[in-house]
């Protein structure tokens, strides 16, 4: 992995599993698959000494990598059996569900029209993506961005019924909106920041148009990795994640690297989460070297 912070790009050697896809995409008549919408949430907190086993005090990668106040972000390692990017270390997230569009869901924060303007999409798409972001972070790490009113969030999720709801959501047995309505809760979209928009490369057979959100870890709640999609989960600093990726210990994707640089550039978690920028979609593309090796290059979007 080669990161150019000054030029704003990252370049990886293409994994063997995708080389055949790249070669197929270069053939005449190739038509890329239409991407599906997805949402990802970077759950962050301000770190403190000895808060996690992954804490590192110095020796960061790369030398000029910004560290701010050493924010921590919650990351998951996907199980090896996943069809899409198995074993990758990612932020909680997933595909938008058709049932994420319920207009009756009590909603607090920017209206769908405001999100749509920033995201460059329709109001319906914006609504579904924002709801999917909140649903996925609850499904995958047990963090609920909702409360009884616009000024609070649920703090105690220890009752077994919450885990039952998570399982039902993961199995598509209940809609997230229905769960919140039944519990008399309001979706707190004001707790979400909007950071970036990445589209899966055109050579992939599964493609996602993914919006990356941020959220401050709610007080009183505990993030976990109790999902069938993750091998392990924990809080890490961006510098640690970058170092693990460079060493080859972690599989990091281009959007993950870009978003880690965004987190590290923030002075604190609150500042990072308050960011809502108008987005420019970015994507990786293959480059064939003289020796026949394929590299995946990604130019980072300019931050507005």
What is the predicted function of each stretch?
Residues 1-304:
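N-terminal leader/linker segments that precede catalytic domains of diphosphate-processing enzymes
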